[in-house]
Amino acid sequence: ADLGRVLGLDRAPEVKTIRRKLGELAAHRRGAEVQAALAIAHAHARPDALGFLHIDGHTRVYTGKKDLPKMHVGRLHLATHATSETWVADADGDPILVIGGKPGASLAGELVDAIPDLRSFLGPRRTATVIFDRGGWSPVCFQALIDAGLHVLTYRKAPYDQLPENAFRTITWTGPDGKRYRYRLADQSLDLPLDGGGTLRMRQVTKQTDDGVQIPILTSNTRLAASAVVWRMAGRWRQEGYFKYARTHFALDALDAYTDQPDDPARMVPNPAKKTARNTVARARTHLASANADLADAINDAVTEAGRPGHHGTALVNPKPSQGVSAATDQLADAVAASRATPSHVPLGQVRPGARLLDEETKLLTHAIRMSAYNAETTLARMIAPHYARAEHEGRALLREAFTLPGDIYITDGQLHVNLDPATAPRRNRALNALCKELTATETTYPGTDLTITYTVKDQPDPS
């Protein structure tokens, strides 16, 4: 009932009603349009944060009974049934857009596919630097992003040569966060080979850590300071921070809906028989090596026997090890031939005829709600920061407390008053009071009415 009053209803809808309404919305198949509209709204609200875009894949573990594809889940260090998505965040790590992932797709492929979505909110001419991890390493992907008017920023994938010590110089730099940083950096250019010939000129900024480890970073942005290249690349973990926070406080990995659909039976997937054939070849090689070792032992035994008195320097070699080598050689040849005849990929319908995919429409809608709620919380966290000394570490915790505080709602003189009960500590109460004054100053009206909302917090009770 209390939640219903906040929503302007006599009571909040039941969970089954919410699920039904979400299903009705998902049936329109317009989740991607909702995401695109939110991205455009984010771009209009925070244009200064669009110069750098963090892009990463996110996997959600599935523990149900449906036959979903297996994917590698980095945080668990294993492959399991899961679904994937591609997330786009702004320079501060705040989510802008989520795109449904394709089964088996690499981050490099998803980056190329995401170019039209990026252009939809960036506009046709604005450039941005796209930041991603080594999973997106692909010179072809780099070229596609650059051709689309975007810059690339990522870690270089091994192998690579170590730079000499005299290539580095110490740089002291003040970051956008106002903090001073000291780096040991080397800045150079290199050419990456492209499939089909040709090269791609890239810039490499290598950071040397205090213990001498070299971390090469590649970018096509030649106007960015070397220190800024390193600082921006390190900021990629802001997006990981969002995933962790949203899993805990916004149910990021919740199932949300049970609707599923058949996977594409014609989609080419790795052939399990190929792995079996390769294992057979490996066992045959091991068996042949063992047979050769047995033959060598037999020859050594014969040599020893021939050197004994009365053998006149001759001795017969046991024929069984030689026969074993011949048989093992034939087995290896047969295994290699069988492996070569086994295709590496086959249509999905041949190996998993009952394969399913979770329907992504509901998830796109619920992600839109989560992203909006998180970004609203982020805006409030920025507003409260000047009024709360511990805002960097406790700002969001204070807001979560404020969201659950009881209070009073009443209407007088064309105003909707929201009067919260006191927070758990005077310093928190003072910060919330300052935030309430800023929110009231916006003169926001309650949706569907002409009532102006005013926010206040009750005073702390007198301890005496």
Mark where each language-model region is.
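An anionic, glycine-rich sequence signature occurring as long contiguous blocks
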Residues: L97-G100, Q143, A148-Q239, R247, ...
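Electropositive, glycine- and tryptophan-enriched low-complexity nucleic-acid-binding patches
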Residues: V73-L122, V213-I215
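Short, solvent-exposed helix-loop connector elements
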Residues: T219, S227-M233, A254-D263, G354-L358
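Domain-level cores of phosphate- or acyl-group-handling catalytic modules
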Residues: A105-L163
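DNA-recognition alpha helix
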Residues: A1-L7
